[in-house]
Amino acid sequence: MMVFQSFILGNLVSLCMKIINSVVVVGLYYGFLTTFSIGPSYLFLLRARVMDEGEEGTEKKVSATTGFIAGQLMMFISIYYAPLHLALGRPHTITVLALPYLLFHFFWNNHKHFFDYGSTTRNEMRNLRIQCVFLNNLIFQLFNHFILPSSMLARLVNIYMFRCNNKMLFVTSSFVGWLIGHILFMKWVGLVLVWIQQNHSIRSNVLIRSNKYKFLVSELRNSMARIFSILLFITCVYYLGRIPSPIFTKKLKGTSETEERGGTKQDQEVSTEEAPFPSLFSEEREDLDQIDEIDEIRVNAKEQINKDDEFHIRTYYNYKKVSENLDGNKENSNLEFLKIKKKEDSVLWFEKPFVTLVFDYKRWNRPNRYIKNDQIENAVRNEMSQYFFSACQSDGKDRISFSYPRNISTFFDMIQKKIPSFRREKTPSDKFSTCWSLINEEKKENLKKEFLHRIEALDKEWSVEHILEKTTRFCHNETRKEYLPKIYDPFLQGISRGRIQRLVPFQIITETYIKNNIGRSWINKIHGILLNINYQKFEQTIEKFNRKSSAIEKKLSYFFDPQEEKLNSEEEIKIFKFLFDVVLTDSNDQMLSKNFLDVHEIHKKVPRWSYKLRSDLEELEGENEETIPMEPGIRARKAKRVVIFTDTEPHNEIYTNLKNNQNYDQNDEMVLIRYSQQSDFRREIIQGSMRPQRRKTVIWEFCQANMHSPFFFDKIGKFFFFSFDIRGLTKKILRNFMWKNGKKKLDKKYEDKSKRKEKRRLEIAEVWDSFLFAQILRSSLLVTQSILRKYIILPLLIIIKNSVRMLLFQIPEWSEDLKDWKREMHVKCTYNGVQLSETEFPRKWLTDGIQIKILFPFYLKPWHKSKFHSSQKGRLKKTKDKNDFCFLTVWGMETELPFGSAQKQPSFFEPFFKEFKKKMKKYKTKSLLVLRFFKERDKIFAKEIKNGILKNFIFIKGKRNDLSKGNRIPLFDLREIYELTETKNDSITSNPIIHELSVQNRSMEWKNSSFSENKIKNLIDRINTIRNQIEAISKEKKKITNSSNKTPYESKIIESSKKKWQIVKRINTRLIRKIFYFVKFCLEQLSLGIVVGIMNIPRMTTQFFFESTKKILDKSIYKNEETEDKITKKKNTIYLISTIKKLISNKKKMSYDICSLSQAYVFYKLSQLQVSNFSKLRAVLEYNICGTSLFVTNQIKDFFQKHGIFHYKLKEKTFLNSEINPWKNWLRSHYQYNLPEIVWARLVTEKWKNQINQNSLVLNKSLNKEDSYEKNKFDNYKKLNYLKADSLLNPKQKQNFKKDSIYNIFCYKSINSKEKSFDMPLEIIIDNFLVSSFRGKSNIRDIGEFRTRKYLEWRIIPFWFIKKVNIESAVDTKSQKIYIKTQVQNSEKIDKITKMGLANQKSLFFDWMGMNEEILNYPIANLEFLFFPEFFLFSSTYKIKPWVIPIKLLLFNFNEKKNLNKIITRNKNGFIPSNEKKYLRFYNLTNDEKEKQRNPQLALPNQEKNIEENYAESKIKKRQNKKQYKSNTEVELDLFLTRYSRFQLRWNFFLNKKILNNVKIYCLLVRLKNPNKIAISSIERGEMSLDILMIEKNLTFAKLMKKGILIIEPLRSSVKNDGQLIIYRTIGISLVHKNNHQISQRDKKKIEKSITQLKKKTVNRKKNNYDFFVPEKILSPKRRREFRILICSKLKKKSTRYRNSRFDKNIQNCGQVLNQTKYLDNDKTNLINLKFFLWPNFRLEDLACMNRYWFNTNNGNHFSMIRIHMYTRLKINS
């Protein structure tokens, strides 16, 4: 029952999944989504449904709904029907059709009333109103929707349509889904309207009651047409904003042909010497395609070719036609070519259709960002895909392949174009699949038979010629042996087809190399047929053989038809003969180059924008003015070019050869770019593009100053209803509560005030920049104000002042005032404030703007103080510095900064007020003395009067006491009575208390005083009455309490509560009494705590700082566990830096990677220890060595066992070869992806990589026994001679078999039972690593042209530039040669190679990267690298396989010659751009080249020398047009950057600001005759920094680094990784074994050979003679692949199933996969025999062919490496 229920449940789940993934459900879902795409058609639909009434209204509703549904149905049909989709999806459809229709509808119905159309039944047919409603809803439904864009849904449809099989069902279901959603939406709208009408509360609350309600409703209904017209107008405006206008859009100019043909005039001169076309090495190779297109248009009857989708063959076949017309005259041919080109341009412009003229699909209609590439000027378009889709036959069926070879498709298309009679008829898929399978079966059987016959012949010991399959040739006549030439035979491979020579890097190509190699490229004759250079002659030749085009079509189809038919007719022989006659070459297999210049490979044109754009900033900079078009196309930030200094004087210390340069400008200008202060709304937008379509820029304010992205909306100051933030309010309250400090409030207030001032200043600057003629007006006003101030206002004030002094009989101060007036300087500045001079105006100062800076401004003073007094006072009093400069405003005021607020000028009358205040103080001091005298006299007089009064008062008091002795009053009794009354709680009034207090007071003060008897009697009576009342009240209360029902328990509660209240009352009184002392104690403790905390702040901060720095350093050391951090310090540092240095030095001792140490080194150190007892190490060694027994050699284990350190016992190994072995062959076949560690580090995380290294990296000498076994196992087999065919082979044949045998050994290793580490040919690993490291063949973009290192090591930098090399340059003005003399000095200071403890050992490899060395003295550029080590340079402790790099390579560049003179010749025409693409060409080797190939070591020194010279030459020439070197430091820095290309130099940020400030002062000081005063004042103000003033003319690179001026930073290069690399590295994780990172003794010599032989990767392979024979070698390689694929196409299924845990695929195999038994290793001899006999069905190198042939992987869904079939691993008994 349970099984049945689970079965039902599983079926239900699967059924639900099928329903969800079905086409119908997906279509319904998509259709329901399209309901929310609301467009203008809904306006008409709602209008018809809401407003129209009556019979006509019903008809309109029906017509509107019908048109709406019909329009949507057309949209869905357009998904399936391609022509309709293209018509509706064009970008110009809406512009041409939708906008005029919208505008017509708006203006036509705008003046009409909604209900007054005047329609009757008679004119119904004439007006066609119902039909118009239908058309409106139909047409508007076809327009793009704007509330929810339909582009997203269209992409979903396209994706699903590509995957869907039943496309019509999908379209139908999506339409039904839309219809359901539309009905639901309309019903919802109707329900909402009905609810609004029926709900009285909404109408009563929202609308006005009484008669006004009806009036408003009628007005709303009458104005409904106007409302809809307004909505339509808004829609039109919206579309106008989103659609590019064809008329007003700026048309960008395409690149001119003269610019495309070459980079410079010199290159064009070189190219025109050979032909009227550009040379092969022109700068813009892709620009030649336009010439090709024009030529092809001419040949193909001017048919239009799409430049983005068409493949071309690069050729210049019109050169022959032109030269024939002009009898070979080259000059006339040039003229003729240009004439033809001009004619073609005019004709092409006329023939362009209207759509392409109005709508340029290559124009930047959308605001895309222009990404400029220095190598390829034109930007690549985004439409380029990395995949190529085409239909192909796979598994006998037509399928769409995303990885179809594009060259095959192009070749087939070219044949169809060039030979119109050729067409292929499509056969039905069923017939083709059956035919395909039958053909494969037949081929397989034939190959089986042939293979068996050859094996039988092998058993019969026939000769090798009859056994082995011979090479297949493309033959015309077998009897005559007429073959296709070897160089063009497609069946041949290798050297017979010619060697593909990869040219030298383009940066080292010289002019002589170009002249020697132009015209040496051969032409592919088969391409020549397809190109049909002389098309008419080609057609006539075809007609000679047969005029029937149908026969030609039938016979030529044999090249491509999969059916096998024999060609026996005469026509077929004629066709083949014709082909061979055309293609046949001369006897020397060389092509005459008089007719053609060159033909390149077939290529796919990358779609690029046809414009070379530059920004406004590049135009302002003025660089490369000749090679850049005039008008800028990129709108950069608003800026202006300001010349701040013009150097007209020649300098002798600069290169003198610059005088002879024609391009040298004698007036060297220093230019600054001035940016506008306003917000950058352009953001490098391209002219002509639509700014409203821009992403990430939204304007939500009416007047928005700055551009913001919506992502930062929460960071921007918002409106009140957006800015209610509870969290922010709580923070503000807490901050104000905690920090009630007046000083901080003042600081914040001052900061806010300064921010407001800066904002206002920028707003004023924006206003001046925004208006058209504002700068002209402002500049003229400033100059006028300057003249008025200097020459009119100030002299007039001086005259008035001195004349008034003369009238007041005072001495005039003419000389002092005139001296101050002359000291004032009006310096003309640029708009940014760069000072020029008093008389020199900046260029274009009227339009660009100007600033006038007043130095030492003149202020009128009423009098001048004496010099001695003022100077002495200034020395004694150090007041704050006063700014002795200001900027002039338009209104003649003074301001501190340009466009700042006017500052208050010192008043003329201020000294008067100061003097008046001083005199008033003097008068006050004198008057105070008089007042003090009178005050003292008043005090004495008052004291005497007081004493007399007191004496009289005492006398009177004594007399009264005597009189009142006889009549005393009993005050104490009264006091007692009233104290008793106070205890009563039921007293009603407070009068007795008051009287008692009054009596008490009197009795206390006047004890002896006598009262009248009447008053005493009254008091006694009152007391008695009150006492009686109290007694009466108490009696009444007792009666009440006795008569009540209260329990004694409640009375006790009341009494207890009273007691508690009394206790609380006492406590309160006590607290009130003691609160003062408590508060005082708290304040004292708080102040004490604050003082202690303030005293502990330095200790806590220093402790926290050291802890944080320690954590940062620990983190950096952990991240770089494989490297040793070399952190260098400056000398004479502060104490803080020295403490950090100690911390680093302590940490560096523990930062080495233990995995990188060798076993020999570790155990050698252990053996040197003077310790006899290893008890402490025994546990560690037993655990580590026993746990990692696979990675410790047997010799070391035996050594420890003999010495009794521990007893080691072999454990059972647990590695699973069943998962590893199927991948080994594939990994070894892709050895080129075994990249260096620095590239591998980019694919995995650092922590994960460290774990893998700790588990898998092995020590250097781990497998000597296994290595010896691997070395000799095939030599042992050679002696056995198990196969008799071995003896039949000749020595030459054995040599040929050796190549395949080296590759075959990897396949057989997978069958070996011995569990061993992953092994690869060591030459391949080392050669791949070293050659890619030092020839630039890495996979990092744009670095391939440099011959650089993998990283920059700090110890090498001072070796090249600081200590050991001095670069000196001399200039020869006549020959224009630069001699750079490089002299190696202090070579004995090279760091020691041998280490302590290892000095007696001889080893080729040494610790050249400074392991176990503590470096503390090397300079560091900036301390920020200390705290952020991730930005530090690559460290130098065993970074990239240091055990592979020998001493010879380390000292390769500078150890051969100590004095090396490089002569670099500068030629005008020798510059070759670095962005030229590589191309392939065929050639035949000469004897000299063959000799160099045989002995590459002979050619190596010359090659190295040429590379170095040409490399430096190209780098210097590349910068020749941009800048000229003026000092040795520039040459040194450029040389540094060229050698270490993956690093860049930058200077400090603060230094940049200081240098700019210094430049501004320099510009003024240079123009002054006596600059001392200005210089001193600028230094005092802090405008000019003395620390960056360079006293030396040529600072070395080391000094710049030490001063912190230059900082080295590594470049973050982008990596291009292909799919195979990632797959290789992913699979290789499980196969990282010790042998991958080790070098045995047998391979040391081969490592040296692989290092020196840089051109060939695998010249010296292993010297083992693998002369074993396998049956597979009988067949040729091509037939071998075919045989494997045919055998594996139908594998027999067996019962054994193997689950691959790595990819989770169920695989059917032919038997047990790699049985894991340790007893299989007993009989290794028989296993080796079996290994040589067995051979795999196919190799992994044929994986691509197998995928397309059988595994059906063209769509990429069924790709799996584990489908590979393996033979059974048999068990051999001894």
Swiss-Prot record:
The keyword Ribosomal protein does not apply. It is found in: Plastid, Chloroplast inner membrane. The chain crosses the membrane at residues 19-39, 68-88, 91-111, 133-153, 176-196, 227-247. Pfam families: Ycf1. Residues 254-275 are annotated as: Disordered. Keywords: Chloroplast, Membrane, Plastid, Plastid inner membrane, Protein transport, Transmembrane, Transmembrane helix, Transport. Involved in protein precursor import into chloroplasts. May be part of an intermediate translocation complex acting as a protein-conducting channel at the inner envelope. Belongs to the TIC214 family. This is Protein TIC 214. It comes from Aethionema cordifolium. The lineage of its organism: Eukaryota, Viridiplantae, Streptophyta, Embryophyta, Tracheophyta.
